[in-house]
From Swiss-Prot:
Origin species: Mus musculus
CDD domains: DLC-like_TCTEX1D2
Keyword Cytoplasm: yes
Similarity comment: family membership: Belongs to the dynein light chain Tctex-type family.
An example Gene Ontology biological process: regulation of cilium assembly
Keywords carried by this UniProt record: Cytoplasm
Gene Ontology molecular functions: dynein intermediate chain binding
Gene this chain is encoded by: Dynlt2b
The protein, known as: Dynein light chain Tctex-type protein 2B
GO cellular component, one term: dynein axonemal particle
Compartment(s): Dynein axonemal particle
UniProt-listed InterPro entries: Tctex-1-like, Tctex-1-like_sf
Function: Acts as one of several non-catalytic accessory components of the cytoplasmic dynein 2 complex (dynein-2 complex), a motor protein complex that drives the movement of cargos along microtubules within cilia and flagella in concert with the intraflagellar transport (IFT) system. Required for proper retrograde ciliary transport.
Domain of life: Eukaryota
C-alpha cells in the first residue's frame, strides 16, 4: 500500500514498518524560525563583497548604452553568486543594479520593503568612475 501527499510518499511493508521517501527536489523543512547569530545577514560583509565585485568589473569600464543591459544582468548574477558562497542558505537574495552615465546630473533612489526587521536586512554600495556610476542594493530575506 502506498499513499502520496504533496511530495511525500509513505510505503507500508509486509512487516508493518513504514518509511518516508522525500522528494529530492524540495528543500527539507527544518522548522527554524530565526537564523542563528553566525548565519544572520551581515550588511558590512555583504557590502565588502559587492564593493570587491564592482571594483574588479567596472574599474576600466566605459559607459555604452548598448552594453549596459547585459552588464547589469551579469553584475547582479555575479554578486548573487558571491553572496550564496557566504553561506546564506536560508536567505532569498535580491540584487538590484542600476548603471547610469556620468553627466553631472543628480539621481535620487529609494526602496521600501515589507519584511521582518529581526531577520531581514539590506545594504548598498556606489561605484563611480569618469564615465559611469553604478548603484547596487542587496536585500536578504529569511526563509521561514
Amino acid at each position: 500500500m502506498a499513499v502520496s501527499f504533496r511530495g511525500l510518499s509513505l510505503s507500508a511493508h509486509s512487516e508493518g514498518l513504514s518509511e518516508v521517501d522525500k522528494n529530492s527536489g524540495e528543500p527539507e523543512n527544518t522548522y527554524i524560525l530565526r537564523p542563528i547569530f553566525q548565519q544572520r545577514f551581515r550588511p558590512s560583509v555583504v557590502k565588502d563583497c559587492i564593493h570587491t565585485v564592482l571594483k574588479e568589473e567596472l574599474a576600466s569600464a566605459e559607459y555604452s548604452p548598448d552594453e549596459m543591459p547585459q552588464l547589469t544582468k551579469r553584475l547582479s548574477e555575479m554578486i548573487k553568486d558571491k553572496l550564496k558562497e557566504l553561506g546564506y542558505d536560508r536567505y532569498k537574495m535580491v540584487v538590484q543594479v542600476v548603471i547610469g552615465e556620468q553627466r553631472g546630473e543628480g539621481v535620487f533612489m529609494a526602496a521600501r520593503c515589507f519584511w521582518d526587521a529581526d531577520t531581514d536586512n539590506y545594504t548598498h554600495d556606489v561605484f563611480m568612475n569618469d564615465s559611469l556610476f553604478c548603484v547596487v542594493a542587496a536585500f536578504g530575506c529569511f526563509y521561514y
